[in-house]
């Protein structure tokens, strides 16, 4: 077993735990920065270690296309290639393939697609994506699944569940024949139909995965449906395994995920928003492109202890964004990931102290408001 619960909130499903990945221990709930192509944009491995991150995410689709498995095999995996010394999770690449629209085609045992880079043709199967992730050398591998659009009707959702469940069974059989130190997580689907969700959760939970992931949420559905599905499944999840909510990284969404028993999160939003001039602070979201910060000599967040806020004024960082300097992206990204790390630590501490709902209300109030304007 790779997961152990260490404390539980008495009023919600929130909990803390320890996730053990080949000797690397992580406290949960945990947020994973996204390094799609083998790097968290604008940051080095040293930066991530300085920020005390121990788990990041890579993307199988992109790493398969470039640099490719032959390069990864030669280096002994992505971690040696990139000198990342901590843990790595890779998604299966299925979501990216299905986002290609006309460039992919379902088959019984996989999906054919054309590269978005050069139009070359490729074929992903449940087995092949495990092989690719073995070349990548991730500590957690994700199975190939079929994520239907959130507004799909019953027929399309049924197709999604049938594929997802069939591919999950194939993945488990293949993985168990050639087990190594890599862990495998299953993914359940069902869109915003709670009956389909519970059916899929039951099927995926019945298989011997190391962890269970919620797929196909936060893909454009109304927020009330996002909350409804989380609430509806929370009483039915396996509390002996880690629960991973894929692609979720806003402050309100993380809070609602934790409230409903989620242990793991990933999202490009903190890094992407940083590059677009939005930073997360203890006062709320701030738009660095706002004219009002032009001459401000205060830090982006007066309560922040990161090296960026200790050294630079918000006026200076706004200037760097305004003139398009690359350094603006790295400084803002560093700050946002520092914020996320502290935010998750505060959540962990609040659960252990029995104060989660107080923290929940505090951050919800701050982050469901418009941007902070001083």
Swiss-Prot record:
Xref: Pfam families: TGT
Catalytic reaction annotation: 7-aminomethyl-7-carbaguanine + guanosine(34) in tRNA = 7-aminomethyl-7-carbaguanosine(34) in tRNA + guanine
Pathway recorded for this protein: tRNA modification; tRNA-queuosine biosynthesis
Binding site residues for Zn(2+): 304, 306, 309, 335
Any single GO CC term annotated in Swiss-Prot or TrEMBL for this entry: cytosol
Binding site for substrate: 91-95, 145, 189, 216
GO BP term, example: tRNA-guanine transglycosylation
SUPFAM superfamilies: tRNA-guanine transglycosylase (SSF51713)
Cofactor annotation remark: Binds 1 zinc ion per subunit.
Cofactor: Zn(2+)
EC number(s) per entry: 2.4.2.29
Gene Ontology MF annotations: metal ion binding; tRNA-guanosine(34) queuine transglycosylase activity
Region (RNA binding) residue spans: 247-253, 271-275
Keywords assigned by UniProt, alphabetized: Glycosyltransferase, Metal-binding, Queuosine biosynthesis, Transferase, tRNA processing, Zinc
Active site annotation, chain numbering: 91, 266
Enzyme class (EC, first level): transferase
Family from the record: Belongs to the queuine tRNA-ribosyltransferase family.
Assembly and binders: Homodimer. Within each dimer, one monomer is responsible for RNA recognition and catalysis, while the other monomer binds to the replacement base PreQ1.
Function (record text): Catalyzes the base-exchange of a guanine (G) residue with the queuine precursor 7-aminomethyl-7-deazaguanine (PreQ1) at position 34 (anticodon wobble position) in tRNAs with GU(N) anticodons (tRNA-Asp, -Asn, -His and -Tyr). Catalysis occurs through a double-displacement mechanism. The nucleophile active site attacks the C1' of nucleotide 34 to detach the guanine base from the RNA, forming a covalent enzyme-RNA intermediate. The proton acceptor active site deprotonates the incoming PreQ1, allowing a nucleophilic attack on the C1' of the ribose to form the product.
NCBIfam families assigned: Q_tRNA_tgt (TIGR00430), tgt_general (TIGR00449)
PANTHER family, sorted: QUEUINE TRNA-RIBOSYLTRANSFERASE CATALYTIC SUBUNIT 1
Protein known as: Queuine tRNA-ribosyltransferase
Provenance organism: Leptospira interrogans serogroup Icterohaemorrhagiae serovar copenhageni (strain Fiocruz L1-130)
Name of the gene: tgt
């Amino acid at each position: 077993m790779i997961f152990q619960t260490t404390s539980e909130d008495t009023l919600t499903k929130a909990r803390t735990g320890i996730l053990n990945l080949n000797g690397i221990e992580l406290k949960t709930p945990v947020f994973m920065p996204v390094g799609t192509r083998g790097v968290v944009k604008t940051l080095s491995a040293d930066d991530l270690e300085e920020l005390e991150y121990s788990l990041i995410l890579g993307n199988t689709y992109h790493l398969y296309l470039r640099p490719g498995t032959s390069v990864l095999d030669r280096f002994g995996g992505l971690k040696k290639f990139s000198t990342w010394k901590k843990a790595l999770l890779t998604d299966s690449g299925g979501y990216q393939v299905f986002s290609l629209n006309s460039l992919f085609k379902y088959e019984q045992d996989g999906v054919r697609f054309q590269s978005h880079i050069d139009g070359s043709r490729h074929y992903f199967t449940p087995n092949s994506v495990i092989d690719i992730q073995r070349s990548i050398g991730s500590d957690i591998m994700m199975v190939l699944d079929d994520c239907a659009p959130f507004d799909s009707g019953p027929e399309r959702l049924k197709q999604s569940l049938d594929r997802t469940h069939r591919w999950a069974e194939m993945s488990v059989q293949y993985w168990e024949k050639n087990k190594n130190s890599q862990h495998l997580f299953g993914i359940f689907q069902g869109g915003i139909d709670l009956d389909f969700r519970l059916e899929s959760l039951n099927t995926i939970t019945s298989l011997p995965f190391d962890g269970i992931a919620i797929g196909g949420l936060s893909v454009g559905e109304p927020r009330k449906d996002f909350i409804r599905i989380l609430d509806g499944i929370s009483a039915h999840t396996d509390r002996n395994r880690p629960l991973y909510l894929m692609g979720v990284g806003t402050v309100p969404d993380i809070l609602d995920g934790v409230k409903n028993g989620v242990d793991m999160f990933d999202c490009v939003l903190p890094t992407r928003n940083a590059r677009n001039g939005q930073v997360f602070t203890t006062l709320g979201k701030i738009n660095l492109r706002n004219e009002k910060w032009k001459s401000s000599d205060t830090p982006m967040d007066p309560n922040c202890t990161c090296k960026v806020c200790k050294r630079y004024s918000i006026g200076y960082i706004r200037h760097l964004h305004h003139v398009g300097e690359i350094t603006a992206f790295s400084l803002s990204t560093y700050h946002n990931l520092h914020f996320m790390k502290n935010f998750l630590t505060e959540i962990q501490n609040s659960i252990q102290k029995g104060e989660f709902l107080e923290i929940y209300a505090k951050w919800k109030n701050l982050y469901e408001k418009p941007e902070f304007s001083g």
